[in-house]
């Protein structure tokens, strides 16, 4: 009714400060889809999970839970943002290789759930400390369709620099 088109779900800060769970993310996703909006579902692992080699397990659990009871037709409208928690607001960022590996793995999980055609239609973004200097190379990765930009989007100079980097 008020023109909202996109809704971010499962952001790490919502999970940390408000106790949002995989189950509540799923319930919200179903509501967002049923109301004609596009969900951007955030998934990602903590530093401890990353260092323990559990990244794939963590994101698979989050993706499978988020898509529970979502039809293939609705799944095509979903955006998934991989945001490694250890990279948010820390100045650390996953290498392009790590980001591509995890985003490709996420696409594979969607393919397991719905088939390759749906997986190719789902947009997958990277959202861990995206900066102008790293954006263009990140978006050249085959399984990264965009970026979920946080803090850098709050500074005009940084945001303009990102746009300019894409135009180079």
Residue ranges and their predicted role:
Residues 1-168:
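Active-site loop-to-helix "anion-binding N-cap" substructures in soluble metabolic enzymes
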């Amino acid at each position: 009714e008020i023109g909202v088109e996109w809704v971010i779900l499962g952001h790490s800060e919502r999970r940390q400060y408000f106790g949002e769970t995989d189950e509540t993310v799923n319930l919200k996703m179903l509501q967002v889809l049923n109301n004609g909006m596009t969900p951007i579902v955030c998934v990602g692992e903590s530093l401890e999970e990353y260092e323990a080699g559990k990244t794939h397990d963590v994101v698979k659990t989050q993706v499978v839970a988020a898509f529970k009871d979502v039809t293939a037709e609705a799944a095509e409208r979903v955006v998934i943002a991989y945001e490694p928690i250890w990279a948010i607001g820390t100045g650390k960022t996953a290498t392009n290789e790590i980001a591509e590996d995890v985003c490709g793995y996420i696409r594979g999980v969607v393919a397991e759930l719905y088939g390759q055609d749906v997986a190719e239609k789902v947009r997958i973004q990277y959202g861990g400390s995206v900066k102008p200097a790293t954006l263009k190379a990140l978006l050249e990765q085959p399984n990264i369709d965009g970026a979920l930009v946080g803090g850098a989007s709050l500074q005009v100079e940084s945001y303009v620099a990102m746009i300019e980097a894409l135009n180079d």
